[in-house]
Amino acid sequence: MASNATFEVEIYGNTTKFENSLKGVNTAMSGLRGEAKNLREALKLDPANTGKMAQLQKNLQTQLGLSRDKATKLKEELSTVDKGTSAGQKKWLQLTRDLGTVETQANRLEGEIKQVEGAISSGSWNIDAKMDTKGVNSGIDGMKSRFSGLREIAVGVFRQIGSSAVSAVGNGLKGWVSDAMDTQKAMISLQNTLKFKGNGQDFDYVSKSMQTLAKDTNANTEDTLKLSTTFIGLGDSAKTAVGKTEALVKANQAFGGTGEQLKGVVQAYGQMSASGKVSAENINQLTDNNTALGSALKSTVMEMNPALKQYGSFASASEKGAISVEMLDKAMQKLGGAGGGAVTTIGDAWDSFNETLSLALLPTLDALTPIISSIIDKMAGWGESAGKALDSIVKYVKELWGALEKNGALSSLSKIWDGLKSTFGSVLSIIGQLIESFAGIDLKTGESAGSVENVSKTIANLAKGLADVIKKIADFAKKFSESKGAIDTLKTSLVALTAGFVAFKIGSGIITAISAFKKLQTAIQAGTGVMGAFNAVMAINPFVALGIAIAAIVAGLVYFFTQTETGKKAWASFVDFLKSAWDGIVSFFSGIGQWFADIWNGAVDGAKGIWQGLVDWFSGIVQGVQNIWNGITTFFTTLWTTVVTGIQTAWAGVTGFFTGLWDGIVNVVTTVFTTISSLVTGAYNWFVTTFQPLISFYKSIFGLVGSVINLAFQLILAIIRGAYQLVIGAWSGISGFFGVIFNAVSSVVSTVFSAIGSFAGSAWNVLVGVWNAVAGFFGGIFNAVKGVVSSVFSAIGSFASSAWGVVSSIWSAVSGFFSGIFNAVSSVVSGVFSALGGFASNAWGAITGIFSGVADFFSGVFDGAKNIVSGVFEAFGNFASNAWNAITGVFNGIGSFFSDIFGGVKNTIDSVLGGVTDTINNIKGSIDWVASKVGGLFKGSMVVGLTDVNLSSSGYGLSTNSVSSDNRTYNTFNVQGGAGQDVSNLARAIRREFELGRA
């Protein structure tokens, strides 16, 4: 059984856990004691059984361990007890008693364990029954310690009483005046309501009834007045309203409600009365503030109205609208009559005391109200004439202005301003010149400069207005300084009020000084004799009153413990405790002397605590007077600080105005320049983006021109190659017979090449005309292109000249070599070349027709492009003439405005020129295709078949002619170029013709 007697105690300041753990310890100890008793009985029958002895020893050791653990936990719990409260004191006494019992048990167990150890050593269970007084003496010491603790509790109680009294009085002093003012407002509201209802004569009856009700209960006069005013406003008579209010206040207190909880109850009940219906929300609010009252009210309503039982509950009846406010009023009357409303607790007594003091202050407050109101009215008059009190400040500003003029500060400022105006003028001039090129904008620049001058004039006018404002501030300060008499009157009244508070707090509640306070009220109204009234109050010795008060407290305690049931029960419990303690003390009287000494010391300490509490109480009174004076000084300090702060704020507003004005000017100018910068940047980007399609457009034009030229020369080469092939073919057939024909061929070829030259000249004239039209509009763009085209045509001319020279030399050689043969066949060849000439003539007509159509096409295209570009730039000129108006008018929309315009122009040019470009590219592709086909019709070269001609006699350098074994002919030529020709390039060209198989 001993093995099962272990446990754990877990205490974290939770009373329930602690008590449960102690129950577990007590249960374990009870089981162990029963086991020990059985072991002792067994050892009496078998004294030599050492096994039983060992079991008993282990059992006692376990009990000792549990006792020590319990004592430790009790000490820990004692250290957390607050002996300043009633519950804490009860708990402390209980824990101290338990700790003494546990310590006594532990001492006894230690003695028994030693006896068992001796029996085990001797081997025989033979223990004499004797009492160890050591543990008992320790118990007596513990008892003395507990009485010492009781003394500490008593001292703490008296100290707490003194501290609570001082705290209550101090806090009450702070709230009395505030409560009196609130009560005054509530009375004014009641009086106005009664006058409105035509019952003004009932004001004294209602107000005195509410004051009496507040004194007799824990209610606040303000709350009772407000509730009765609500009832009267809803149509109740004065008597009915008073009855309802009394019933509600008394019922709240009867069911345990405090004065603070009454506020919530009054609010909820007043809302239901005003709305004329009982809502669940208001009933819940009433119940939350006073649960007992809410429950009793619900049950009373159900009992007084049996018809409501059909709804089952108050909540259901309320939801159905079956409960009326009249039912609530009757139930509340019943509850209020049962409660009686008498003061029942110390807290209620304090509430009643505070309310009495607040009501006593009402006459004083009524007397002071007219004085303070007149002072406030005078201050209102100061406000109306404040504009006349600023002369001194205006004078100061004028003197300051004169000093600034004398020391040159204003002239420096003027120079700075002139410099700024000059800077603005220069900048605006630059902007005007920039925009002037767009037409019409320079006029707006002049208007902007005029705006800057207008701003400077406005600033000057504002400075004049500022002088008037400062003059008004000076008038106000002067008027304030002239009102010293009114301020002194206010000061005298406040001092009188302070003296009245001091006299009231010392005299009220201890002695009766009604006549003295009436004199005090009269003295305050007259403003004289304040200290005389105070001396009359203090004529009675306050220490005599103090003794009477202490005697009253003692008498009250005697009455409490002898006449009241609660006091009798407390005293009987205390007597029982003394009896139980005395039984232990009588048995062991050795410590009684020290006990009486401790009691006496406790009494002395208690008296000291009481005296210290009284000292603290009077110190609180002095501190209250100091606080009032501090409030007065704080009032005037705050007043002066407010005046100074107002002047500083006014001056800061003036300086802030000029600062904001200058910042506004800077922001406007910055915005203008930023907008213009964005405009120029956007315009530049627009030009780059807009004319990009034009570049592509003219690139396509020049590509077309190149294709046309390429087609022309392909045709020329084709004609030459075809003619040459025909000549070679004819020569192959009749070379032996028709040598004389070559003279005719020479003239025909000359005619052909003359036509070719005319064609090239016409083509060039057309190109020059096109180029001149383009160069007239974009001369700068075409200069670079013209150089390129010029070099290209120079190369083409050089090539044509060289080619013509070669052809001429070839034909010269041929005609010289075969002149006789050509003469013989001239008629035949003449017919052949006549047909060839007809073919060439027809071909040339077709070509000129094509180029005529091309020229007409380009003429129309350029006219359209010219009209489009002209229209665009005309629109741009119109836009530029109105640009400044747009800039000064709408800064926010200018970006999107230009974006839309430039985007539209760009899209227009993209669509128009893009289509033209595509058309030209298509034409170029068609011409290139024709050129490739024409070039493919007559593949060959001017040097084809030269291997069959012996050119050794021509002087052009055929130096070697040999035939290899495989019948291939190898010719070696010495090539000499014409004037301006590069021989190496010519040789490479001839070599390339051989490699390509065209020669």
Swiss-Prot record:
The keyword Cell inner membrane is assigned to this record: no
Pfam family, one: TMP_3
First-listed, main subcellular location of the protein, grouped into a coarse class: virion
Alphabetic keyword roster: Viral release from host cell, Viral tail assembly, Virion
Record carries keyword Transit peptide: no
Any one Gene Ontology cellular component term annotated for this protein: virion component
Coiled-coil boundaries: none
Domain of life: Viruses
Localisation per UniProt entry: Virion
GO biological process: one example: viral tail assembly
Similarity remark: Belongs to the skunalikevirus tape measure protein family.
Task performed by this protein: Probable tape measure protein. Serves as a base for tail tube protein polymerization and acts as a template for tail length determination.
Protein name stated in the entry: Probable tape measure protein
Species: Lactococcus phage p2 (Lactococcus lactis bacteriophage p2)
